[in-house]
């Protein structure tokens, strides 16, 4: 690989460029019409203007692929956010002979859909949270709520969700309809899909994620864990690696479960498999998988002394 187009902006674009340059790879930046003075452009070897302004310019697959072909980029790194988990973007890159730095299209299709990800976990005998596990109507949601023991709480999630958007905690059945309406609207705006599913809301659990890495040929490994329980509005605020709350037994069980899920799809690149852990009841449940580089990857880099972005590029 001699040239890499970085399909992002800001901090993550700069982070990727640093690792690419360390590997002797030419870096190519992109920018929207209103990002002409953005800092990330000064860190690239070359830059190309995208048509349009704002966020929409960085979500235009056709335009970005066109630029990649024009500048003869050999690979594309999507960073995080924007098109990083879009299977269509991965497909178009590979179709045009450009390496996609990330998981394959088929993997993104599974992990980008929270229901499909839960189905995979169940298939691999990894426990999941009790829920509807399918696109759910208001009537089905009401039926599910009634099936739980008295005093239970429900959480609404977007099927295509991420980043805490499209999520609502419902403490009473009478609040269900209004919460569904709000969550559906938010999911539609954020992900282009209003589809929702429902789970029992588990309180007083630790949120633990296992960092995984795979080469796409059936070899996968783990890069230990991160504790991300401290959150506000479902957004992670503080991450600690390794988790100070995990017992050795639980750590081994979570790692084994994460690797089984990754092996099932011949995982390629970096990703995280996330769990809720209740150490009082000695149980854990799979929540979701993120098939991309995460903002908090630097926390893991600090404890291992590895450059995870370099690893991504080398695998690609």
Describe every region a protein language model picked out.
Residues 41, 158-161, 235:
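Short, flexible turn/loop "capping" segments at secondary-structure junctions
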Residues 145-156:
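Acidic/histidine-enriched active-site and ligand-binding environments that engage anionic O-linkages
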Residues 131-132:
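Conserved beta3 strand of the protein kinase N-lobe
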Residues 137, 171-172:
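Alpha-helix N-cap recognition
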Residues 1-124, 136-143:
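ATP-binding N-terminal substructure of ATP-dependent carboxylate-amine bond-forming enzymes
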Residues 2-27, 47-49, 69-71, 102, ...:
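ATP-dependent carboxylate activation and anion-phosphoryl transfer catalytic cores
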């Amino acid at each position: 690989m001699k040239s890499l187009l970085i399909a992002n902006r800001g901090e993550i674009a700069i982070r990727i460029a640093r690792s690419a340059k360390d590997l002797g790879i030419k870096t190519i930046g992109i920018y929207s019409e209103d990002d002409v003075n953005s800092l990330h452009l000064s860190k690239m070897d070359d830059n190309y203007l995208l048509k349009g302004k704002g966020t929409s310019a960085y979500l235009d697959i056709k335009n970005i692929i066109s630029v990649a072909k024009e500048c003869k980029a050999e690979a594309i790194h999507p960073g995080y956010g924007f098109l990083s988990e879009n299977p269509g973007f991965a497909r178009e890159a590979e179709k045009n002979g450009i390496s996609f730095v990330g998981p394959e299209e088929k993997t993104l299709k599974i992990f980008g859909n929270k229901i499909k990800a839960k189905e995979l976990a169940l298939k691999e005998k990894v426990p999941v949270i009790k829920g509807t596990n399918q696109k759910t109507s208001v009537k089905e949601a009401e039926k599910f709520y009634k099936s739980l023991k008295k005093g239970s709480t429900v959480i609404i999630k977007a099927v295509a969700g991420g980043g805490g958007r499209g999520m609502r905690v419902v403490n009473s059945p009478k609040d269900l309809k209004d919460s569904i309406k709000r969550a559906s609207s938010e999911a539609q705006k954020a992900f282009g899909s209003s589809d929702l599913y429902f789970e029992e809301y588990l309180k007083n659990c630790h949120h633990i994620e296992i960092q995984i890495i795979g080469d796409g040929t059936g070899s996968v490994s783990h890069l230990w864990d991160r504790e991300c329980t401290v959150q506000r509005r479902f957004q992670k605020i503080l991450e600690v690696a390794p988790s100070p709350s995990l017992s050795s037994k639980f750590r081994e069980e979570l790692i084994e479960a994460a690797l089984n899920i990754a092996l099932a799809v011949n995982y390629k690149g970096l990703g995280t498999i996330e769990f809720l852990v209740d150490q009082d009841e000695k149980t854990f449940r799979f929540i979701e998988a993120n098939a991309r580089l995460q903002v908090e990857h630097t926390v893991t880099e600090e404890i291992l002394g590895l450059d995870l972005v370099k690893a991504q590029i080398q695998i690609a």
